[in-house]
């Protein structure tokens, strides 16, 4: 079974990488109602903090991604950097936005930095991303990873539009409201992150 990265995820948050979780996803996760979707589907996001609820490996990852939505279809360009091995990998994802709010289930192709497809999406693997909070500068998202009909566990990520920026007071409050503490999260600021901003510019 493939293990899943802790950084998507942005999302992210790639179904072909090496950081994973196992166990059922939380069943009481729903998108925050009334959120302006433009707050999330605008600009580039950097994962500054992540919480893997059941980690299996110790490699640390950096990630950035750009989500866009048009007529209910979400498309994302994701970049991941393994801070331990100094390696990069790239994905293009696509999914459908749920009618209930800022929540979508996506599948991903593995591509190179020029976006040429290296591996088509595995139809049995997906993740559902739920936006718990978002404002002009930062966001909190929950991700449920799946292989077929089996949940592989919960992943929370804090996103900001600026590299190494702290989340807003509103997003910090959302972390607390989710029953979590930001101190539980792994911060990416000191990992020596590298990014490919050209790739993530849709």
UniProtKB/Swiss-Prot annotation:
Q: What keywords appear on the UniProt entry? A: Blood coagulation cascade inhibiting toxin, Disulfide bond, Heme, Hemostasis impairing toxin, Iron, Metal-binding, Platelet aggregation inhibiting toxin, Secreted, Signal, Toxin, Vasoactive, Vasodilator
- Consequence recorded when altering residue 117 to A: Reduces anticoagulant activity
Where is the secretion signal located? 1-23
Q: Which molecular function terms from Gene Ontology are attached?
A: histamine binding; metal ion binding; nitric oxide binding; toxin activity
Q: Where are the transmembrane segments?
A: none
Biological process annotations from GO: vasodilation
Please give the annotated consequence of changing residue 115 to A: Reduces anticoagulant activity
**Assembly and oligomerization:** Interacts with human and rat coagulation factor IX (F9) (inactive and activated) in the presence of Ca(2+).
What's the protein here called?
Nitrophorin-2
Q: Which organism is it from?
A: Rhodnius prolixus
